[in-house]
């Protein structure tokens, strides 16, 4: 097999927070494929980077009292424990704010401009009147114009995958202030994706059988006329707005002061920038590397960013004169407990760093996710009970068990030296060797679940051989040393083959086994050979613990609830029992003007108010507010009165309503009476609703 040269990436995480389990799942999926390719002897450059630009980072940095650069650097500093902890073998980790990305993004733009695919248009852009700034796409929310989903971002819909302009949103609002944004004009730069050249290229590129069927079918929808929920019709591919206005943390557009590239233009360029950064460190020429006709380029992404990677990205590369991806591998989302969305507060969130800090073996998770992953973009489900059962049964009960049942006899009885398998043992080993091509093909096609099922079926056959021959009984029988050596040798040879087949998924365990068996680094080529008679192995040491249910309980334990706030009694008394809206509607509250006010002779508490309630006649109302107000303080003011309260005959006259005022239940502890007064503009007779 000739050596291939591969350039592999994962989607760039946005640099505004720590990795979540979705990131780790994608990195594990890509890492398994990369390790398989390396075990085939191929040259792989596997790179990642932080997506470091955009208004959300700029705003978050400002809130944190940092520059955007320092904010991103602090996030990047926390990546290593995750990547090392889960054995992710990136060759390089970079940032889209690096000089390589600035240079490459600007050059790609200039090449697209030279190709006649950049144009400017005056657009109406949302502006937050409360924050006094143009709103980034991710700070505008509303209803998707394509499928009608609510609370979607201003640049793309997470439900249907549509990409649109923020102004296309239905019922938009500012995510920063909640205000309804206003439109202001601004000149923007567009990539002419609707150009017939782009359409023809993308129709061919996306439908040539390379992409997953479900992905190709989804992308195909965007080339056809379609009716949107807002009543408009999309005729096909739309031009792509690639600019944003200052203030913005990003890469400046050449010869366009105050204009920056939209983050989704420079983010995928970050793949190339990270590769260039790696090659520069190796002293290799980036341009020569990319010009190699044998170079293969692959991207692993989630299904929520298909449009960017299968339309914009290949078109940008092709029409700027660069290599296009050989494939884009799309995966689904990770759910928990039969499709439930993960939630830390409900105790169903899987925090990858917490997993590591609890001392849980990262290769348990690598194995479990691999056993669920396939070549389609289906969601996969994490079930804690299934996780424990599968890891304990497959890895410990089947795979590790083979070595633990044989290695001790080899070391104690035969000084660690292997023998020669007999005919029945050779037949079993040939079955294992014969499975190698199929297992390799499944890894190549990213059908990890099928590959691991094949491996575990082989492990079952080996364990059946062990159970049939019972080395622990052979060890007790005089004259059976040769058979004992034969059986145990077959077990060790089989264990080595199974280790080769599992090594892309379990790299750390693979290294332990290589040390134990004294084999050197194992590759798939080694599946056709054997350790051989006379080979000396090391002393067996326990290779893997079982999953403990206590660890799982701790992993999914919800965070401690915030202490309950002290129960407050508003105004010094408990709230009244709930009423219905119909109950409230019976009370007719009206705005009243206090035309006159006077003290009541014989009372220290009451004031007599003459009120205009808009009826064309005055009302007489007594109110117990004399301790707080003098008559001259109230005359000419407006207040709120209960207008339909039945007249009440009092010692000093008839009261024809009730003026609303507030006070504390304990007037001695908190003295004060406060008559309600509407804001300016209210007039007598208006109803309070």
UniProtKB/Swiss-Prot annotation:
It catalyses: tRNA(Met) + L-methionine + ATP = L-methionyl-tRNA(Met) + AMP + diphosphate. A motif ('KMSKS' region) lies at residues 341-345. Zn(2+) binds at residues 144, 147, 157, 160. Its EC number is 6.1.1.10. It is an enzyme of class 6 (ligase). A motif ('HIGH' region) lies at residues 13-23. InterPro entries: aa-tRNA-synth_I_CS, Anticodon_Met, Met-tRNA-synth_bsu_C, Met-tRNA_ligase_1, Met-tRNA_synth, Methionyl/Leucyl_tRNA_Synth, MetRS_core, MetRS_Zn. Keywords: Aminoacyl-tRNA synthetase, ATP-binding, Cytoplasm, Ligase, Metal-binding, Nucleotide-binding, Protein biosynthesis, RNA-binding, tRNA-binding, Zinc. GO terms for biological process: methionyl-tRNA aminoacylation. ATP binds at residue 344. Its main location: cytoplasm. GO terms for molecular function: ATP binding; metal ion binding; methionine-tRNA ligase activity; tRNA binding. Residues 583-689 form the tRNA-binding domain. Coiled coil: none annotated. Homodimer. NCBIfam families: metG (TIGR00398), metG_C_term (TIGR00399), PRK00133.1 (NF001100). Is required not only for elongation of protein synthesis but also for the initiation of all mRNA translation through initiator tRNA(fMet) aminoacylation. This is Methionine--tRNA ligase.
């Amino acid at each position: 097999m000739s050596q291939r040269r591969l350039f592999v990436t994962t989607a760039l995480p946005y640099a505004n927070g720590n990795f979540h389990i979705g990131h780790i799942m994608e990195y594990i999926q890509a890492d398994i494929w990369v390790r398989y390719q390396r075990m085939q002897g191929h040259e792989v450059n596997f790179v990642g980077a932080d997506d470091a630009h955009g208004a959300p980072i700029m705003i978050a940095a400002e809130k944190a009292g940092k520059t955007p650069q320092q904010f991103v650097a602090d996030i990047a500093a926390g990546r290593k424990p995750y990547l090392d902890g889960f054995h992710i073998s990136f060759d390089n980790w970079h940032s889209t704010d690096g000089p390589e990305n600035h240079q490459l993004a600007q050059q790609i733009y200039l090449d697209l401009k030279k190709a006649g695919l950049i144009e400017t248009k005056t657009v109406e852009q949302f502006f937050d009147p409360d924050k006094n700034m143009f709103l980034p796409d991710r700070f505008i929310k509303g209803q998707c114009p394509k499928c009608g989903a609510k609370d979607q971002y201003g640049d793309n819909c997470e439900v249907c995958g549509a990409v649109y302009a923020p102004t296309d949103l239905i019922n938009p609002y500012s995510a920063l202030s909640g205000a309804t944004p206003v439109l202001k004009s601004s000149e923007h730069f567009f990539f002419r994706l609707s150009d017939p050249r782009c359409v023809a290229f993308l129709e061919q590129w996306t439908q040539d059988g390379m992409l997953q069927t479900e992905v190709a079918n989804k992308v195909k929808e965007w080339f056809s006329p379609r009716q949107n929920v807002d009543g408009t019709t999309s005729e096909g591919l739309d031009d792509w707005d690639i600019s944003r206005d200052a203030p913005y943390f990003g890469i400046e557009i050449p010869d366009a002061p105050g204009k920056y590239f939209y983050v989704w233009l420079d983010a995928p360029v970050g793949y190339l920038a990270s590769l260039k950064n790696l090659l520069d460190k190796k002293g290799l020429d980036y341009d020569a590397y990319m010009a190699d006709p044998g170079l293969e380029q692959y991207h692993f992404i989630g299904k929520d960013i298909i449009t960017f990677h299968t339309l914009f990205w290949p078109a940008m590369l092709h029409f700027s004169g660069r290599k296009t991806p050989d494939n884009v591998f799309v995966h689904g989302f990770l759910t928990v407990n039969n499709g439930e969305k993960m939630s830390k507060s409900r105790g169903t969130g899987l925090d990858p760093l917490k997993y590591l800090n609890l001392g849980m073996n990262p290769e348990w998770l690598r194995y479990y996710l691999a056993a669920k992953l396939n070549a389609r973009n289906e969601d996969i489900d994490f079930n804690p009970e299934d996780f424990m059962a599968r890891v304990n049964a497959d890895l410990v009960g089947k795979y590790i068990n083979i070595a633990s049942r044989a290695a001790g006899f080899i070391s104690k009885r035969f000084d660690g030296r292997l023998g020669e398998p007999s005919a029945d043992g050779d037949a079993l080993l040939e079955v294992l060797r014969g499975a190698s091509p199929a297992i390799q093909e499944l890894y190549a096609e990213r059908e990890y679940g099928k590959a691991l099922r094949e491996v575990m079926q082989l492990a079952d056959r080996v364990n059946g051989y062990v159970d049939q021959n019972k080395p622990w009984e052979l060890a007790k029988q005089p004259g059976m040393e040769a058979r004992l050596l034969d059986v145990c040798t077959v077990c060790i040879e089989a264990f080595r083959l199974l280790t080769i087949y599992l090594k892309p998924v379990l790299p750390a365990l693979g290294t332990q086994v290589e040390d134990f068996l004294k084999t050197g680094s194992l590759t798939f080529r080694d599946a056709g050979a054997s350790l051989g008679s006379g080979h000396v192995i090391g002393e067996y040491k326990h290779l893997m613990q079982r999953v403990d249910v206590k660890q799982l309980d701790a992993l999914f334990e919800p965070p401690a609830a915030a202490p309950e706030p002290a129960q407050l009694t508003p105004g010094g008394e408990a709230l009244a029992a709930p009423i219905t809206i119909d109950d409230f509607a019976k009370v007719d509250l009206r705005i009243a003007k206090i035309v006159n006010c006077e003290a009541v002779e014989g009372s220290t508490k009451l004031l007599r108010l003459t009120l205009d309630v808009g009826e064309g006649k005055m009302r007489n109302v007594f109110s117990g507010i004399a301790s707080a107000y003098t008559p001259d303080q109230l005359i000419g003011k407006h207040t709120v009165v209960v207008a339909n309260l039945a007249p009440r005959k009092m010692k000093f006259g008839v009261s024809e309503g009730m003026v609303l005022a507030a006070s504390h239940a304990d007037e001695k502890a908190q003295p004060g009476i406060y008559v309600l007064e509407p804001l300016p503009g209210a007039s007598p007779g208006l109803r309070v609703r």
